[in-house]
Amino acid sequence: MDENLLVAKLPQYTKSILNALNAAGYEAYVVGGAVRDLLLGREPGDYDITTNARPEQVLALCQAKSWHTVDQLGQNFGCVMIVLDGIATEVTTFRGERYDESDAHRPAATWYCDSLREDLSRRDFTVNAMALDIHGQVFDYHGGKADLARHLIRPVGKAAIRYQEDALRMLRACRFVAQLGFDYVQDGLPGPACGMAGTPYYLKSVPRFPVERCRGLSLERVRTELEKLLLGEFAGKGLMLMLATGLLQQTCRVRQDGVYIEVPLLPEAQHLLGLAQNPRFHIYDTWEHTLLAIDSSPRELAIRWALVLHDLGKGLSNVRIIKPDGQPSDPGHEAQSAKMAEAILQRLRYGEDFSRLVVWLVAQHMRFAPMLLTGEKTLRRWLRHEAANGPFRTQAQLVAGYKLLTEVFLADMGATHARENQQLMAEGRALGEQVVAMAQESMPIASQDLAVKGRELLELVPQNEIKNTFAYLINRVQSGNLPNEHDALLAALNKKLARKKGGHYERT
């Protein structure tokens, strides 16, 4: 990319900081992921700056310019946070780092250094180890631009050293694969292949990771990386790398009551690799079907997690059967998968609302397909059952849940032979839209979902009857024979009261 074009893409607040540091006699560069994204033609999420100015010198410069800085906690690591144009920018002094076995992520010692080359040498991957100055010159000492051109994620230096230093880098490698769609390469002897040759997720050579180092990582950091991976455009590719290298089978840790507790990541997924499915319906084994479904879905965390977990019950001894034609089948696997999903999300410390939603998506993901052959009455019964028993407190939550479930269903179906049948996929989409519309129009759950308010009902019934009255109206609307409209609801209630009292109540 043209040097002038790179600089032109920098936001003004970033240029102001670079120019101010340069004018004061210091080196200053945009560094890391922002440079990578600019070279790829992507919009960076943020713009980190590195400089040979020490934190106190950066602070003095900010004070002279009346620039706001955030609290100075970051100075312990040579970092000053400058807030300009309402946006925070990390300005970090060139530094070196030393790691030891005492911590799986944080360096044992840091020090300031005077060289950009030394600062870039401590970074994780070549595509993240580049710097850009205000004139548009890219400083690339480790072949980052070449790896970008070849779509490669490669550690800076020797992979074994990089991962022994900071175990989180192994998860970051998988995350960048998921976000960028690049292949991962490293030094050393090639490992064995993994997956089905000819599929999008086949790995010709699995890299060797010191995965046992993950045990010292905090659950919070691991979950953050895993979520970023799941939301990547190529999440399936990143997950395949995690499983093939053994990362998914590892544990991290969480501190509870003063002691560390081991938390498994996702070892339950291992048995899906190579697990055969009925070729009448399926293209791939269960794991690669899962990956394709994930990549076929919208990048929303609840959807992605539901698809990761939706087939975990397949192949288990209490689920799998072999049919008379010799083909495998997994009847009821969705219930087993939902049970496993609940345990997994709980141990990964997800909140109750999120967990219940994902578990519901997993449990319900097989319900849509039979509905293609049924009528409106069956759809309504299903909706009413889930309105009463699902993880929803309001109609809006129910509608949102069915929108998510539609996407889970379509992604799951689209990872089978059905993906080749455009008419069937269109019918599936239409069914989802029909169910969502029905939920929006006639499936209130709470009193607040009705078009009448409690104060209006108090003019018609005693206060101790309000709850039952709301329940009556909700039931009528859900049954489909009463629209959720203000006048219609009051008319229906008046009619009911007239039958009960032998007279008709008129509001005054």
Locations of regions flagged by a protein language model:
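Catalytic cores of the polymerase beta-like nucleotidyltransferase superfamily
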Residues: 1-508
